[in-house]
Amino acid sequence: RSCLVGSEMCIRDRYKDDREKIGLNIAKREKRKLIKPFDDLHVIYGQGTAALEVVNEIDTKFDMSIVCCSGGGLAAGTGIVLKNIVHNCQLYTAEPKNWNDHEKSFIQEDIVSIQDKKYGICDALENPKPGEITFKINLALETKGLSADDKYIIEAMKILYDEFDLIVEPSGAIGLACILQNREICQNKKIFTILSGGNIDANRYNELLGIEDG
């Protein structure tokens, strides 16, 4: 659809190519400004508006926030909003177990990179380390990290499909997956989370959920 309106699509190999370097090269070649997907204050503020819309519509003081996390922009933007409204709201990032760089970084209070890159079902969250700007914000907000195994991610996708008629990709269901895997800290809590994205091939979705064609 993007190509139909004149856009040029750049295909990359997720296992070999560096998407940031590709973007920088295109921006340099075409004399354009590169807008980073998370490590940019304007982007972070924009991502925070999702939380702002929720708190403006729902008269609820959340105890916890568990937000899907790749580079940390959505978590940072959400955290800024929630902490300014509910000061004692505990913030968490949600990541797949093999890509829990934020969880590890918060423990160390310094940026930790994933070295053993085991690619899984949450391709949108497979960023090896937190952003410089986002990490400073999240650390200042006293954010902590949670992570989930694939079985909980798939369980979350099934719940969203069966109970809410929602088709959500693995990366988008990671917040609910972390709730399911960390029930002991989530009991009797009012929790803010975001279900983000349905970008998954139909055959792959059915395969993960065990849905037979036809």
What kind of region is each of these model predictions?
Residues 62, 131-188:
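Active-site-adjacent helical/loop segments in soluble small-molecule enzymes
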Residues 39-141, 186-214:
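Glycine-rich phosphate/pyrophosphate-binding loop at beta-loop-alpha junctions
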Residues 1-6, 10-11:
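Single conserved hydrophobic/aromatic residue that forms the stacking wall/gate
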